[in-house]
Amino acid sequence: MAFAFHILGTSSSGNCSILESGGTRIMLDAGFQGPRLEASLAKLGLACAALDAVLITHEHSDHCIGLAALLRQNPALKVFANRETARRIQGALKVKPDWQLFETGTTFEFRGLQ
């Protein structure tokens, strides 16, 4: 299956990438504030509502600060994280995301992607 990988930013001021394959769009980390996140997606012709899932690698703000903005615009978004990362991030959120928990080091699947 073919895929496209777009790096929106990678630095101490924010990390964010998009993986697209077979009509599925997964954001890898959401390390930008809402307006920057939206502008970065718009450059790809996308909006927050077009995302199917986000995978948060860890709880540092340069990897997850935009999660609340994503969830405001896409409440059904699936959020992948390991249990400890989810626990730490949940404390800062006003809503409860659709957490998809995985064990670090294991393989998991989402819409045919592993």
Predicted regions: what is each one?
Residues M1-L44:
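Conserved beta-strand hairpin/beta-sheet module of binuclear metal-dependent hydrolase folds
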Residues G34-A81, T85:
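Active-site metal-binding motif and surrounding structural segment of the metallo-beta-lactamase
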Residues T10-S11, A30-G31, N82-R83, F102-T104:
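Fold-independent oxyanion-binding glycine-rich loops
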Residues M1, A47, Q73, L93-V95, ...:
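Short, structurally constrained coil/turn elements
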Residues G22-T24, Q73-A76, K94-P97:
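Short glycine/proline-enriched coil/turn segments at helix->beta-strand junctions
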Residues R83-Q114:
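Metallo-beta-lactamase
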Residues C16-S17, H58-H60, F108-G112:
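Short, solvent-exposed polar/charged micro-motifs at secondary-structure junctions
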Residues I18, G45, L71, T106-T107:
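Short secondary-structure boundary/capping segments
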